[in-house]
């Protein structure tokens, strides 16, 4: 399962680099949680949650970013910004489906703090 997650994050990273984003950190961890990718697009810090689902049961990948997960991401992002300097930021999601190898959905501003 961990390998599948690592592969999904690597695929998402390559996709976002092709879209012009720059990697700042991978798997940023603190006591509040973890952010899969921290990237930069222009002057904006982009916190990216990568989700892979094998099927659409229970809403697919997007539905798996529930309120508790969003709160952990927000706290972790605040921790990152306190240590690395404040900047405009947003939360994006990359949604991948095991059933559709070519299917990458990039949701910019997936949620707000």
Curated annotation (Swiss-Prot):
Stored InterPro entries: Restrct_endonuc-II-like (IPR011335), tRNA_endonuc-like_dom_sf (IPR011856), UPF0102_YraN-like (IPR003509)
GO MF terms held by the record: nucleic acid binding
Q: Which cysteines are joined by disulfide bonds?
A: none
Signal peptide limits:
none
NCBIfam families, sorted: PRK12497.1-3 (NF009150), YraN family protein (TIGR00252)
The entry assigns this protein to a family as follows:
Belongs to the UPF0102 family.
User: Can you name this protein?
Assistant: UPF0102 protein Mfla_2283
Lineage, top ranks: Bacteria, Pseudomonadati, Pseudomonadota, Betaproteobacteria, Nitrosomonadales
């Amino acid at each position: 399962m961990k390998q599948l997650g690592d592969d999904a994050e690597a695929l998402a990273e390559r996709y976002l680099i092709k879209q012009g984003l720059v990697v700042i950190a991978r798997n940023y961890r603190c006591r509040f949680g973890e952010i899969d990718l921290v990237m930069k697009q222009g002057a904006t810090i982009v916190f990216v949650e990568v989700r892979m689902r094998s099927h659409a049961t229970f809403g697919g990948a997007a539905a798996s970013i529930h309120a508790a997960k969003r709160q952990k991401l927000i706290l972790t992002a605040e921790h990152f910004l306190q240590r690395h300097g404040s900047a405009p930021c947003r939360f994006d999601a990359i949604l991948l489906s095991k059933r559709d190898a070519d299917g990458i959905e990039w949701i910019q501003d997936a949620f707000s703090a």
